[in-house]
Amino acid sequence: MEPQLNQEVINTAAQHDGPIETDAVIVGAGPVGLFQVFELGLLEIKAHVIDSLAYPGGQCIELYPDKPIYDIPAVPMCTGKELTDSLLKQIEPFGATFHFGQEVSVVEKQEDGRFFVETSKGTKFLTKTIFIAAGVGAFQPKLLRVDGLDQFDNTQLFYRVKNPADFAGKNLVIVGGGDSALDWALNFVAEGPNKAESVILVHRRDGFKAAPASVAKMKELCDAYEMQFIVGQVTGYDEKNGKMTGAKVTGADGVTRVVPLDVLLVFFGLSPKLGPIAHWGLDIERKQLMVDTEKFSTNIPGIFAVGDINTYPGKKKLILSGFHECALAAFGAAPFIFPDKKIHLQYTTTSPKLHKVLGVESPVFD
């Protein structure tokens, strides 16, 4: 399900006796982090990209790889995976180096103005600039708190769906009232290769945060006896021979009923956590990094923040906004990397220099 990097892009880091010296380190390989590679590349700035996930795409891949996105300019509709794949193709010419499955644990300013960066896996860098594109930070699913339930993690209890085929033909109990819960309930009821044997949706109340159309469709399916909806909360489980056989659901009437199941899917949303970023000395407001809107610089010169991780007056958490921020951040970083060079704005439509950087032929006009 995860997007695949081409060999030219993956360029995994070779073994180094000392830190990897580079012009830019990007923290986060979501859509905004990937586009930051592009904007830096146009200025001939090469980057290393670090992400805690094992693959690129960030929230787009982790949360909604197959859900449609409608607000990317000139792309009427694409999925999170399609957007990620397109961005990976777009940044191929710039040969970014990716370091997956690791978090940045140390950031220290050096006497020469550079930053020493170390990851949780011990990868070390000396970089002139840092771009934080970490989305909402390290996001963790909100857990269903029932004593002993965690023993079934990733066998019968799941907080996300990586491969829908794994749940085909199963008796599913889905807990939650947001878009993810409703979307997956409808997905597993629908005819097709991933159709479940049965789907029961459990939510603590009759009101939902999900899209009204999804709620209406769910109720229509319940009326047709194709799925069930129960108002209540999961308060326990039945177990036999080390296997969960049912969820105990307590309704508003105080009565607890046992609902048979093969798999319990829980969608309570995500709890964003800044993680180590919170200890880097950056100005933070409500778990977001404060930036100026000229260069998207933080309070520490040389460290920039783009995408959902930042905040400023009028901030809108849109992928589109993040892309705009990447361009200004790249130009804002250029003086740290090329202090004696004046950077001119050039256009990819007409600049032979940019055509060379992109590896394309310059058009000849009559």
Curated annotation (Swiss-Prot):
SUPFAM superfamilies: FAD/NAD(P)-binding domain. It comes from the Bacteria. FAD binds at D51, Q59, Y64, V104, F139, D308, T349. InterPro entries: FAD/NAD-bd_sf (IPR036188), FAD/NAD-binding_dom (IPR023753), Fd--NADP_Rdtase_type_2 (IPR022890), Ferredoxin-NADP_redctase_2 (IPR050097). It catalyses: 2 reduced [2Fe-2S]-[ferredoxin] + NADP(+) + H(+) = 2 oxidized [2Fe-2S]-[ferredoxin] + NADPH. Its EC number is 1.18.1.2. Its cofactor is FAD. It is an enzyme of class 1 (oxidoreductase). Keywords: FAD, Flavoprotein, NADP, Oxidoreductase. Binds 1 FAD per subunit. It holds the Pfam family Pyr_redox_2. One of its GO terms (molecular function) is ferredoxin-NADP+ reductase activity. PANTHER family: THIOREDOXIN REDUCTASE 1-RELATED-RELATED. Homodimer. Belongs to the ferredoxin--NADP reductase type 2 family. This is Ferredoxin--NADP reductase. The lineage of its organism: Bacteria, Pseudomonadati, Pseudomonadota, Betaproteobacteria, Burkholderiales.
